[in-house]
Amino acid sequence: MTNSSSSKKQAQDQPETSEPTLKSLKTKMTKSDEKQKKLKDIEISVPIVYGNVAFWLGKKASEYQSHKWAVYVRGATNEDISVVVKKVVFQLHSSFNSPTRVIEEPPFEVSESGWGEFEIAMTLHFHSDVCDKPLSLYHHLKLYPEDESGPLTMKKPVVVESYDEIVFPDPSESFLARVQNHPALTFPRLPSGYNLPAPMQVEDTGKKKRGDTKDHSLGQWFMSFSEADELLQLAAARQQVQAHIAKLRRQISLLEGQNQTVKTGSDL
Amino acid sequence: MGGTDAKDILGLPKTPLSLTQEKKSRPQKESHRKPDGISREVYALTGGVAPLMPSIDLKRRPPADEKVAWKWLSFTNSARKDDLQLYHWVRVVNDVPPTGDYSFAKYNKSVDILKYTDEEYENHLTDSVWTKEETDQLFEFCQNFDLRFVVIADRFPVSRTVEELKDRYYSVNRALLRARAQSPADVANHPLMKEPYDITRDRERKRALSMVLSQSRHQEKKDAEILAEAKRITEMRLAARRAEEPDVSANENAGLDKADGVVPGRSVSPTSNSQLPATAVAPSTLTMADYASTLASLRMLHVYLRTYGLEQMVQAASSAVGLRTIKRVEQTLQDLGVNLKPKVPTKTVCDEHLELRKEILTLLNLQKQLQYKESEGSSHREGSYAAMPDTPKDRVFAPDPFSFGAERPIKKEQKRKGPGRQADTPSPAHKRPRKLKASDL
């Protein structure tokens, strides 16, 4: 299922990317500079989800320890994003012990207990071949449910998540070579004449030893994000707007005809 | 440090609270100065408090030896030509009689009227309408009645209007000034030369004033309504002209692109099977140029979020139009049941969202054009009633109101499931019984 959806995404991106890529390829042939590090008009995107899951502690809850919560950054389908992200720095509230938490291995999450809701900053640092600049995300910790009618329960946690994509325009060749065919990334289709160097085996071996993010302890509570619903909404809205545009154009042409008749009459 | 730099690069509004405390300026102490006339010992007794009553200057006293009396005395008035003597009461001090002229004689002012000789009249002042006797009489009356032309017209032996009298008087004065001057430059700054009397304009001004003063209340209301209607039509035409201006600038951009011979950038919108109509090409070219520059600036950042990119695109498209139009676009999006910010901002969703915004802008522009043409048509029809009295009024096309409320809005709640990507089909037929549903928020 994952492979088919990713291939479909690549198919969707194909008509946009092919012509500029061919053009950039021609430019490269003209320059005959094979050492060029970055590919133009290609962008890699990494779908991510960041948010928190909070459990009420029930009878054990006290004034200052009412919830046990976890804040995290994960791949959209729980893929391992450590091929891109080197470490994540979580900035918690200053009242916590060591409020700055650095997580250098997946899963990139922080588990804590407390009573307050506050803003958490998450700074993503990437590998050297990916990007030198870190990227900051901001999430407001949510412990209490929106609807006040239901009583607090230990069985159902409060889950608040946001979907986004990290976009890397002009990625480097080594980055492309390292992450090709990885499920965590949306990979554009390269031109047929272009060949990437073979990936190194050492990194593959190293990757297998790391923690597996597929079997996450909180995986059952994660939200699923589907673009199909939103695309349907947008398509229906566009159809309505286009119908109105056509109607208004007909009315304008009718009025123009009538105004011309009136002008001709006045001229006579 | 890294976080701050990232915030600056991404343009996020995460500014810390400014705790700058302004220094309080010290109020200056008021120094109480000892008032004059009071001794230092007396002022010290008051303790610096301002005195409640002003100090009385006891040194100044009216002189006791002065003698004042009122007497009935006669006086002469130099303003009169005869030697009439009148009497009035006069204040006499120390038996000294008053001297000097009558105190009110100084208010007898007279206008300086130019005089002309018979020789000057023959050389410069002859006129086909006015005789010399009439002109002499006019100037005598101007002297006697101090240029009050209404009174002069009433007393004048020949029947002439106020404007005619004024015109003769001022033209004679201008001719005399011009004749007596050494050169034309000497009298160029004279008021009579700079601002000559215009008999035609004076007549028109009085006629208009008379009409305004004599018009009825009903006519006044009617005039106000006509002016308001004219103002509204003018504003509509200006708005329509302003709406058409972006097309011109878009064409200029297209020309620049052709001159450079460089494609502005990769197309943001996905490849669509249906071609855009001709009228829609110009605004898309405008937004295309903005998109190209925004894409270039996004590429400068080595990494960015998809939501940030979408925000930049929306801002670039919005910069070309006004704030009211932006509000209307967003209101339309809400009426259609679409999120102002996509919940799942993938590349495809963002591109569709931008296309929708562009089409809504086109729709709003067409609405403005329709309103403008309707008002134009109605104004033409009113003007042509005399030429075509049989034109029926029923042929006016009433515009359909732009409201999506009547139509059923599409609002789907997002389905939330466990881990694993959801199938592309919007409604899967079979659900796994083992997976638990997440709590709906």
UniProtKB/Swiss-Prot annotation, chain A:
Disruption phenotype: No visible phenotype, due to the redundancy with TAF14. Modest early flowering. Taf14 and taf14b double mutants show a pleiotropic phenotype that includes small size and abnormal leaf morphology. Taf14 and taf14b double mutants show a reduced H4K5 acetylation in the promoter region of major flowering regulator genes including FLC, CO and SOC1, and a more pronounced early flowering. Residues 38-182 form the YEATS domain. The keyword Transcription regulation applies. GO terms for cellular component: cytoplasm; NuA4 histone acetyltransferase complex; nucleus; Swr1 complex. Expressed in roots, leaves, inflorescence and flowering tissues. Keywords: Activator, Chromatin regulator, Coiled coil, Cytoplasm, Developmental protein, Differentiation, DNA damage, DNA repair, Flowering, Nucleus, Transcription, Transcription regulation. Residues 1-20 have a biased composition (Polar residues). Residues 229-263 form a coiled coil. Its main location: cytoplasm. It comes from the Eukaryota. Residues 1-36 are annotated as: Disordered. One of its GO terms (biological process) is regulation of DNA-templated transcription. Belongs to the YAF9 family. Negative regulator of flowering controlling the H4K5 acetylation levels in the FLC and FT chromatin. Positively regulates FLC expression. Component of the transcription factor IID (TFIID) complex that is essential for mediating regulation of RNA polymerase transcription. Component of the SWR1 complex which mediates the ATP-dependent exchange of histone H2A for the H2A variant HZT1 leading to transcriptional regulation of selected genes by chromatin remodeling. This is Transcription initiation factor TFIID subunit 14b.
Swiss-Prot record, chain B:
This is SWR1-complex protein 4. The keyword Phosphoprotein does not apply. Its main location: nucleus. The lineage of its organism: Eukaryota, Viridiplantae, Streptophyta, Embryophyta, Tracheophyta. The keyword Nucleus applies. Transmembrane segments: none annotated. SMART domains: SANT. One of its GO terms (molecular function) is DNA binding. CDD domains: SANT_DMAP1_like. It comes from Arabidopsis thaliana. GO terms for cellular component: NuA4 histone acetyltransferase complex; nucleus; Swr1 complex. One of its GO terms (biological process) is negative regulation of DNA-templated transcription. Residues 1-38, 244-277, 373-441 are annotated as: Disordered. It is found in: Nucleus. Residues 429-441 have a biased composition (Basic residues). Component of the SWR1 chromatin-remodeling complex and of the NuA4 histone acetyltransferase complex. Interacts with EAF1A, EAF1B, TAF14 and TAF14B. Residues 126-175 form the SANT domain. Signal peptide: none annotated. Keywords: Activator, Chromatin regulator, Nucleus, Transcription, Transcription regulation. Belongs to the SWC4 family. Residues 268-277 have a biased composition (Polar residues). Component of the SWR1 complex which mediates the ATP-dependent exchange of histone H2A for the H2A variant HZT1 leading to transcriptional regulation of selected genes by chromatin remodeling. Component of the NuA4 histone acetyltransferase complex which is involved in transcriptional activation of selected genes principally by acetylation of nucleosomal histone H4 and H2A. Residues 21-38, 373-383 have a biased composition (Basic and acidic residues).
